From Swiss-Prot:
Localization terms from the record: Membrane
Disulfide bond positions: none
Quaternary structure, from the entry: Present in high molecular weight complexes in tumor cells. Interacts with SDCBP2.
GO terms under biological process: blastocyst formation
Chain positions carrying an annotated carbohydrate: N129, N159
Protein name: Transmembrane 4 L6 family member 1
Positions of transmembrane segments: 10-30, 50-70, 94-114, 162-182
Top-level taxon of origin: Eukaryota
Keyword presence, Transmembrane helix: yes
PANTHER family from the UniProt entry: TRANSMEMBRANE 4 L6 FAMILY MEMBER 1 (PTHR14198:SF18), TRANSMEMBRANE 4 L6 FAMILY MEMBER 1-RELATED (PTHR14198)
Gene that this sequence comes from: TM4SF1
Length: 202
């Protein structure tokens, strides 16, 4: 098995997932495509935690690019630097993977909390509050109660959909980074898939 190619595949996957996380988080700021709720601070508190933008997004790009740089055409060096041994590079990628695990874990936790608490919305009494906070997430199974939120329109569906997407994307990122931890340790201990001659030339 070529540990470098595996890392590169994981890296490219993480880039795509990170961009999707950023997009999903940005959409949370604009229910129904409107900007007034963000400017009036009538959004769920967990939207402002930037879990998709920072945790599952920008923070995930660091390990992603590290993983991509591990697999070179000549199979020598570390991220283009020939004076860095391949095994050392694979072991160092474990640290980058741990950063990814922290970022994706943050994304998953915040998304789960956002789903459990529900959106900030205008209720039938004309007050802005977390209508479903006391249900401990049970509102997710009872869609008939979603109409209790009168404004923004369809805010429950909006929040549930996007936080669920962030939860899923963050979970996939977490698994991929965990796989890279194992891949990095095995690659560092067992070496790359290069021939002995290539390893000597390095």
């Amino acid at each position: 098995m070529c540990y470098g190619k595996c890392a590169r595949c994981i890296g490219h996957s993480l880039v795509g997932l990170a961009l999707l996380c950023i997009a999903a988080n940005i959409l949370l700021y604009f229910p129904n495509g409107e900007t007034k709720y963000a400017s009036e601070n009538h959004l769920s508190r967990f939207v402002w935690f930037f879990s998709g933008i920072v945790g599952g997004g920008l923070l995930m790009l660091l390990p992603a690019f590290v993983f991509i740089g591990l697999e070179q055409d000549d199979c020598c060096g570390c991220c283009g630097h020939e004076n860095c041994g391949k095994r050392c590079a694979m072991l160092s990628s474990v640290l980058a993977a741990l950063i990814g695990i922290a970022g994706s874990g943050y994304c998953v936790i915040v998304a789960a909390l956002g789903l459990a608490e529900g959106p900030l919305c205008l209720d039938s009494l004309g007050q802005w509050n977390y209508t479903f906070a006391s249900t401990e997430g049970q509102y997710l199974l009872d869609t008939s109660t979603w109409s209790e939120c009168t404004e923004p329109k369809h805010i429950v569906e909006w929040n549930v959909s996007l936080f669920s997407i962030l939860l899923a994307l963050g979970g996939i990122e977490f698994i991929l980074c965990l796989i890279q931890v194992i891949n990095g340790v095995l690659g560092g201990i067992c070496g790359f898939c290069c021939s002995h001659q290539q390893q000597y030339d390095c």
